[in-house]
Amino acid sequence: MTDECQPVAVSRRICAPAREIFQVLADPVRHPQFDGSQMLRGAGSATVISAAGDVFVMKMYYAAIGDYEMNNHVVEYEHDRRIGWEPAAGRGHPDYDPGDPAAARWGQRWSFELTPDGPDATIVTEIYDCSAAPEHERLAIDNGSIWAEAMAKTLERLDALCARQGNQPSPA
């Protein structure tokens, strides 16, 4: 019998409208600025996420692997409300198979939900769901709970980034 795996969710109230926060989340170039895991090194291109089905590449670093890339398949996209992707191993990752790139998708999903809390604030929830991953992989990462601290740090950094952005004059 296997234990049921529940998604890990961390929330924070950020004093910025959902629209502004979503703009940051939909721009992979900005992801290293708020990444709480400190694994993200940069985006593979300057393309902004605009729909489910998009794929964006992130340059990553993990001590056991070194430098590598992840191909992130956007599976959830509701403008200003929800965005989510499923990562797959990319170039430099030991699980990457250029002949079958879809084979390196592990059943993990990262997403952000934005719930307006008045006109100038938003409850942001980051969700990590590994329920579709093989059981041995879920157990190796304690059903995703190992990410909770990094997720809290991500939201803290996103809050600070949006606060700085909110103090900038709007482009004309």
At which residue positions do the language-model features occur?
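Hydrophobic ligand-binding cavity/cleft-lining segments
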Residues: M1-T47, A51-A52, A172
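Hydrophobic pocket/interface hotspot
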Residues: E20-L25, H31, F56-M58, V74, ...
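A conserved amphipathic terminal alpha-helix motif
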Residues: A103-W106, I123, I127-A172
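Surface loops and adjacent helix of pleckstrin homology
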Residues: G36, Y61, A88, I127
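Short secondary-structure capping micro-motifs at structural edges
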Residues: G44-A46, V57-Y61, M70-N72
